[in-house]
């Protein structure tokens, strides 16, 4: 089994380097062993170098660290704040209900990932398990986010309503006018005020559909 599997690039490269050095030292030691003319000094020196290589590869093996970068990225994505500004209120309620349903799984995955990330020397298996849990709950979080719907654009209705309000505010002088024309003006003014109230209700309704907004805009323009 390759001990560098799932380890950080730096610690894995360090281990591989020390392993190559140890393998080179084994070959040199074998040459000394096979050399019947080797002196005691040569044997002692090679023994020391072999021991140094053993210590170096053991240290490199102990220094191997599980690569947590994937887990860290997944964790950071999981804890991102979900912006519900500009979303339809009904869809926000549905989103919150969906999040509530996975709250325990979410908290467990988040907590475990945080513990592993804080741990200076977790096993590769621990990192992999934590990542698996984070990715599993992230799919459910994504499903919940997809429930959110943007509010429809009502800016054209707001503009039309403001124009109608301006028309209502600009009251003409009725002095010297016939009663019929005054009555007609008052009736139209009441209709306009009613249209303004209806328009405001649609504007204030975050769940209003594009058709409701469009229909209300037409009514306001008729009242203009």
Where in this protein do the model-derived segments appear?
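Amphipathic, heptad-repeat alpha-helical segments
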Residues: 1-33, 61-117, 147-203
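Charged, amphipathic alpha-helical scaffolding segments
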Residues: 23-63, 110-149, 196-224
């Amino acid at each position: 089994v390759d001990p560098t599997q799932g380890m950080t690039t730096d610690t894995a490269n360090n281990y591989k380097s020390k392993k190559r050095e140890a393998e080179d030292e084994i070959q040199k030691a074998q040459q000394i062993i096979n050399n019947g003319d080797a002196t005691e000094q040569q044997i002692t020196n090679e023994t020391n170098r072999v021991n140094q290589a053993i210590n170096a590869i053991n240290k490199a093996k102990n220094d191997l660290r599980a690569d947590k970068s994937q887990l860290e990225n997944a964790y950071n994505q999981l804890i991102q704040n979900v912006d519900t500004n500009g979303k339809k209120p009904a869809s926000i309620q549905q989103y919150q209900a969906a999040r509530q349903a996975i709250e325990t799984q979410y908290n467990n995955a988040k907590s475990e990932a945080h513990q592993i990330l804080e741990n200076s020397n977790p096993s590769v298996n621990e990192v992999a398990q934590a990542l698996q849990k984070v990715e599993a709950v992230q799919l459910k979080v994504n499903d919940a986010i997809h429930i959110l719907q943007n509010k429809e654009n009502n800016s054209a209705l707001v503009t039309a309503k403001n124009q109608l309000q301006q028309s209502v505010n600009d009251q003409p002088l009725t002095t010297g006018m016939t009663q019929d024309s005054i009555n007609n003006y008052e009736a139209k003014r009441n209709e306009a005020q009613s249209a303004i109230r209806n328009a405001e209700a649609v504007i204030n309704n975050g769940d209003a559909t594009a058709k409701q907004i469009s229909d209300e805009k037409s009514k306001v323009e008729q009242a203009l």
